[in-house]
Amino acid sequence: RACEAAGAAFRVFGGRLLFEPEAIVTSDGKPYRVFTPFWKACLAAGAPRTPLPQPKRLRFAEAKSDRLEVLKLLPTRPDWAQGLRDTWQPGEARALARLGTFIKDRLANYADNRSRVDIDATSRLSPHLHFGEISPNQIWHAVAHAMSANARAVRGAESYLRELGWREFSYHLLHHFPNMPAEPLRPEFVDLPWRDDQAALAAWQRGETGYPIVDAAMRELWHTGFMPNRARMIVASFLVKHLLIPWQRGADWFLDTLVDADLANNSASWQWVAGCGTDAAPYFRIFNPVLQGTKFDPNGDYVRRW
């Protein structure tokens, strides 16, 4: 409206999602609250638009800028960011290279290995997605092309695209339920008698719970800003269902420490683990940290590393 009043044209070019929230709704115009029918509706809507080619020329206005180091936002000792620099190389070129490596080396076995925490089996594109260094459309079409070119990659590709679907679902939920980061989507969980145990919360944050797989994951998070998705589910279940600490405290910690910290994904995932989301794991489903470690870190390599 402000643009119209000023006589300026205003157009929106969505690029953060595969499908805009207004485009994927039920037959009566309501948001989907269960993932499977939501994803079926997305697939029925057709393939996302093909990414546009890189422009041959861009015109930028000249602007003066200082380097981030000038702001002195981080202490020099200890160098808290060293682990991030050792683990991540930001930028579009690195994102595209990581996508290519994933498709070449890991996509075919993704469905079988994606939950392993002891091997590098996933794309690790989430930070690049979060910061807009690569678009979900680029990933979709690259994976779809690999699926059509290699029959061995079909199962892994379908599994991977489904994970992109969960990202879409999280964004759609946040769009329709903007209080999701703070309030359970199932109102019966509002008055759950959580524990206010600051010592237990601190032990979880520092990786000092005494459970090897939990502690390893929390230490990896602190040093690198990342942990595998399976590890996220394990530590989240431990905080919420073993320590009985509110899921919002865990979500806050993840937002502070994850390099791919994303409000939609983070909120929906924590509500899923806690059992208070729209399409969540049952409240009585508890991840056994010992059995999870045995299954997804069978030789203890992940625990020994961290």
Descriptions of predicted regions:
Residues R1-A47, R219, N265-N266:
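Trp/Phe/Arg-rich N-terminal binding region typifying the photolyase-homology
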Residues P31, P37-P184, F296-W306:
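Glycine/tryptophan-enriched, flexible segments
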Residues G14-F19, Y110-A111, V154, D252-W253:
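Short amphipathic alpha-helical surface micro-motifs
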Residues A8-F13, F35, F102-D105, L244-Q248, ...:
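Short linear motifs at secondary-structure transitions and domain/linker junctions
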Residues A2-A6, A95-A97, V240, G275:
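A generic short-segment signal for beta-strand/edge and adjacent turn/coil regions
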Residues L18-I24, G46-L52, V70-L73, A199-A200, ...:
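Low-complexity, flexible helical/coil segments
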Residues C3, G7-R11, R33-F35, K56-V70, ...:
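Short secondary-structure transition/capping segments
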Residues A121-W306:
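Active-site-proximal binding-pocket segments
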